[in-house]
C-alpha cells in the first residue's frame, strides 16, 4: 500500500488526480493478483476496500481519467494459466461491503424498508461455481474474472461434502464457498509444520493444486448459498425457496440463516455477533439479501455487484479523537449531511481530520457535541464515521432547522430520517446539480470539473445548467480570471458545444429530475416516448400519465415525480432555454442499413458492457442491421446479449432455450458479418 495518501480527493489538481488514479488502479490490480492467484494477500480486506473505494470516488470526481479497464468496472480475477478456462453461464459478481449498522440500514431503507431479507454467514474461503447437468456434477469453476474462470473440476470432486450425483436429474448452477473448519486447519497445518497462515489461504491454494490427489489430502468442505435452475418448471419466488431446494438436493448451506423484516436487521446482527466467536469455521461477516426474487429483479445490478445485496463486515479499525468542529454539506437533492472536524488521527495508513455523522437520529443516539471524545472507524468510506461517544462534549449537536447554504427551513421526507433543503435555488444544490450534469456519464463536458463549476457559480457566471450555453458571451471577462486562460476556455467551450450533440437519452437523466434517470429514460424511449414534447403532452393528461404504469419498470413513485416535474414552471423554463440553446430534445432515430443480417431476429440486452455504453448502443446496432429490439425476454425473443450484472433475463433465456451471447461472442459475430461497430455507432 502507498504510505502517503491525501485525505480528500478534492484537494487534488487534475494532474495529481490522473497520477493518483493510475497508481491506485495498478496497486489494486497488484493486490487482486496476490489475493486471487497467489493466495498470498499482503493487506487486509478492509484496507483493500479503502483502496477500491478511493479509486471509485476519484473516478467519479475526475471521470476524464477513468479507464475502460479500471478495476472498478470488473471483479477481481483468480485466473491461472495452468488451468483450462471456462466461460461462466452466469456472471459471477462480488458484493458491496458495509462496515456498520447505520450504513447497512441506510441501504435497507433505500431498497425496501418493509421487505423480507435473508441474513446469513459470510464464509471466509474460496469462491466456487458448481455446474450440474441432469443431476451430475459437470464442472467446478473458480470465480475468475467474473465471466471466465479456471476449470478445477478434478480438484472439486475431492471436496468431501460436495454431492457428485443429485437425487433427481436436474440442471443447476450454484455459488458456493470452499473452506476448512478451524479444527481441520489446525490439524493439517500441524502436520505441515505450520507453514500456512490461515484457513482461507489454504483453501484457495488447495483447489488450485495441479494434482487432484494432493487436493484430496486436504480437509476441504463447502457451503452453497445461491443457485439458478435453468429449465426448471417451478419458478422460485424467494431466496428462501431456493435454499430449501438446495437442502433437498443434499447441498450443505450455511447454518443459522434467518429471514427477517428490514426493521429487524439491526437486532438480528447483534444476535449473529454473539455467535461469531463460537463458530467452528471462518467467517468475516454477514450477507444480507432481499428475499423476494421479483424485487431483486427490480433493483438490478451494476457491472460489479447486485444492488439487492450487501456484505456486512465485522472487522473495522477504530481510533479515539476529539471533535473540534461540526459543519454541514448540502447535496444536489437537498440532503443535508453533517460532518465533524476531529483532531488528526492515523487510521488505516491515512491521516484523518474529518468524519461523517450520517443523520440526526444517529447523532441523537450517540450524543455528539464539540469537545466530545469519540471513536472513529473506517468502515468502507473515504471519510470515516463517528461510531461511539466516550466522553460527551459541550452540547449535543443538532442539525439546524434552516439550510446552512440558503437559510431555507429544512424538511423531512416521507420514510427518510435525513433532513432536506426544499429550496431549488439553494446555492449548494444548484452547484452540485451543475456538477452532476457535466459528469462524464452524463453530458460529459470536458474542462468543467468541480472546482471550475464552483468558481463560475461563486463569481456569478452561472446560476443553472442553461447558463453554460451562454458562457461564451462572457469570454473576455473570464479570461481575466486566474485559471481561465485561452487554452482552458477553448476546451470548456468546445466541451459545452459538443454536449449539444448528445442524444436525448443522455440529456433527460442529466438534468437530474427525481425518478428520471437513465433506466427510466430508456424505458420511455423504448415505448415511443422519445421527445420532450411527447413527455410534456403526456404530463397534461392524467389518463396518459396513468398508462405509464403499464410499462414494466415504472412504478407509482415515477408517476408522481413525472407529474410534479413537468408541471413545475422552473423546470419548464429550463427545458425551453435548453431547447433555444440547440440541445437535442428528441431521441435520435435509429438508422437502417441496406445490409440486413439480423432480419427476423428479436434481441434483448441485459448487464453491462465495455464497448457499448450505454448498452442500448448494441441494440441500436441490431436494429440498424435489420433486427428488432425488445425490452423483455419471452418465447418470441430469439437472442439475448448478456454482460456482467445480468439477472432474471438471463435466467429466463436459459429456461426458454434462447441463444445467449456474451460481449466477446457478439463482437466475434459482428466481425464475421464484416460489421465495424465503431464506425456504425
From Swiss-Prot:
NAD(+) binds at residues 45-49, 94-95, 120, 143, 177, 289, 313. InterPro entries: BRCT_dom (IPR001357), BRCT_dom_sf (IPR036420), DNA_ligase (IPR001679), DNAligase_adenylation (IPR013839), DNAligase_N (IPR013840), NA-bd_OB-fold (IPR012340), NAD_DNA_ligase_OB (IPR004150), RuvA_2-like (IPR010994). One of its GO terms (molecular function) is metal ion binding. It catalyses: NAD(+) + (deoxyribonucleotide)n-3'-hydroxyl + 5'-phospho-(deoxyribonucleotide)m = (deoxyribonucleotide)n+m + AMP + beta-nicotinamide D-nucleotide. Zn(2+) binds at residues 403, 406, 421, 426. One of its GO terms (biological process) is DNA repair. SUPFAM superfamilies: BRCT domain, DNA ligase/mRNA capping enzyme, catalytic domain, Nucleic acid-binding proteins, RuvA domain 2-like. The keyword DNA damage applies. Keywords: DNA damage, DNA repair, DNA replication, Ligase, Magnesium, Manganese, Metal-binding, NAD, Zinc. The active site is at 122 (n6-amp-lysine intermediate). Its cofactor is Mg(2+); Mn(2+). Gene3D superfamilies: 5' to 3' exonuclease, C-terminal subdomain, BRCT domain, DNA ligase/mRNA capping enzyme, Helix hairpin bin, Nucleic acid-binding proteins. Residues 593-681 form the BRCT domain. Its EC number is 6.5.1.2. HAMAP family: DNA_ligase_A (MF_01588). Belongs to the NAD-dependent DNA ligase family. LigA subfamily. DNA ligase that catalyzes the formation of phosphodiester linkages between 5'-phosphoryl and 3'-hydroxyl groups in double-stranded DNA using NAD as a coenzyme and as the energy source for the reaction. It is essential for DNA replication and repair of damaged DNA. This is DNA ligase.
